[in-house]
Amino acid sequence: MKNRVSSIPFNIRKDNNKKKLIGKAGEDRVADHLKADGWKILERNFRYHKKEVDIIACKDDIITFVEVKTRKSVEFGLGLEAVDKHKRKNILGVARYYIELKKLHDFNVRFDVASIYRTSFLYIEDAFQA
């Protein structure tokens, strides 16, 4: 077992770490954007089972669950294209759990998607419905 782990090429681990750093930088940019617009960040990288929502924020009577997709290349498509039916279902599941956990039933709920590619930044409010 130990030999299997050590046989993984170093560059794969390095690339995985680089992807995490790129993703975190994108999430930081979106969190800053939300804060500048008056949103309070409630959670970052909130997990429920093996599913995750990148940012949960609130403003007035709205709570938004934000999926952030950061790309350094469009080789595999734009970030928005990665928020498919399966990903939306996962986000909805986490949102339901979070609302129940925190007793936020009186809030209006919104699902936003942010896509970052190099210097371009696209933020879509109400990107999909529950």
PLM region spans:
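Catalytic cores of nucleic-acid endonucleases
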Residues: P9, T70-T119
